[in-house]
């Protein structure tokens, strides 16, 4: 692995540096590589109170409000307190935990694809699959049963055992 001298050199310099692809020749600093927990402009429910504020670049009004924050909070109005909160966090807990209406879109897509599948199956039954075989009609099934009974097939335990040949009906 690393020798003791190499390890101490790495620790002193802050680690192995790699050159960025956007700025060849200069090493990327750790502050440039660090990403804030606010990804896609919203606080994550798993990490609701990040170390870094939401707004890092402040305007003149916001800087003045930050200076006023250092004084007594009793002198701040409700709107100023809300503005200070919005500088630190993007959303409140209520906004963060608010349910979205995304389930309606998901259910709509699910029902659309179920309906589309049903239409494809109906189309296949009407136009693709062959017609029913003639031997599956009720008339032909009755003729097949009568033929089995006339041949007296399996007279001990089969169909012929349950048929009364004298009365021409099923035994009760």
Swiss-Prot record:
Membrane topology per record: Single-pass membrane protein
Listed pathway(s): Energy metabolism; oxidative phosphorylation
Segments for region (Disordered): 1-33
Subcellular location: Mitochondrion inner membrane
Annotated CDD domains: Cyt_c_Oxidase_IV (cd00922)
Mitochondrial matrix side: 19-101
Domain of life: Eukaryota
Pfam families: COX4
TM segment ranges: 102-127
Tissue spec. comment: Highly expressed in lung.
BP GO annotations: cellular response to hypoxia; mitochondrial electron transport, cytochrome c to oxygen
Mitochondrial intermembrane compartment spans: 128-172
A single cellular component GO annotation: respiratory chain complex IV
Keywords, sorted A to Z: Membrane, Mitochondrion, Mitochondrion inner membrane, Transit peptide, Transmembrane, Transmembrane helix
Sequence ranges of Polar residues compositional bias: 16-33
Family of this protein: Belongs to the cytochrome c oxidase IV family.
Function: Component of the cytochrome c oxidase, the last enzyme in the mitochondrial electron transport chain which drives oxidative phosphorylation. The respiratory chain contains 3 multisubunit complexes succinate dehydrogenase (complex II, CII), ubiquinol-cytochrome c oxidoreductase (cytochrome b-c1 complex, complex III, CIII) and cytochrome c oxidase (complex IV, CIV), that cooperate to transfer electrons derived from NADH and succinate to molecular oxygen, creating an electrochemical gradient over the inner membrane that drives transmembrane transport and the ATP synthase.
Subunit structure: Component of the cytochrome c oxidase (complex IV, CIV), a multisubunit enzyme composed of 14 subunits. The complex is composed of a catalytic core of 3 subunits MT-CO1, MT-CO2 and MT-CO3, encoded in the mitochondrial DNA, and 11 supernumerary subunits COX4I, COX5A, COX5B, COX6A, COX6B, COX6C, COX7A, COX7B, COX7C, COX8 and NDUFA4, which are encoded in the nuclear genome.
Protein name in UniProt: Cytochrome c oxidase subunit 4 isoform 2, mitochondrial
Species per Swiss-Prot/TrEMBL record: Rattus norvegicus (Rat)
């Amino acid at each position: 692995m690393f020798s003791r001298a190499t390890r101490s050199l790495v620790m002193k310099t802050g680690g192995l540096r790699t050159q960025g692809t956007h700025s060849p020749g200069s090493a990327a600093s750790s502050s440039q590589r660090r990403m804030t927990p606010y990804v896609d402009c919203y606080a994550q429910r798993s990490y609701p109170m990040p170390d870094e504020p939401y707004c890092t670049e402040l305007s003149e009004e916001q800087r003045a409000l930050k200076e006023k924050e250092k004084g007594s909070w009793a002198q701040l109005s409700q709107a100023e307190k809300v503005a200070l909160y919005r500088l630190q966090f993007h959303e409140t807990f209520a906004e963060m935990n608010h349910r979205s209406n995304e389930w309606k879109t998901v259910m709509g897509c699910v029902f659309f694809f179920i309906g589309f599948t049903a239409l494809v199956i109906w189309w296949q039954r009407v136009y693709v699959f062959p017609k029913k075989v003639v031997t599956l009609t009720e008339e032909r099934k009755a003729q097949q049963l009568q033929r089995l009974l006339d041949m007296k097939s399996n007279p001990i335990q089969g169909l012929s055992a349950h048929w009364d040949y004298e009365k021409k009906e099923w035994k009760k």
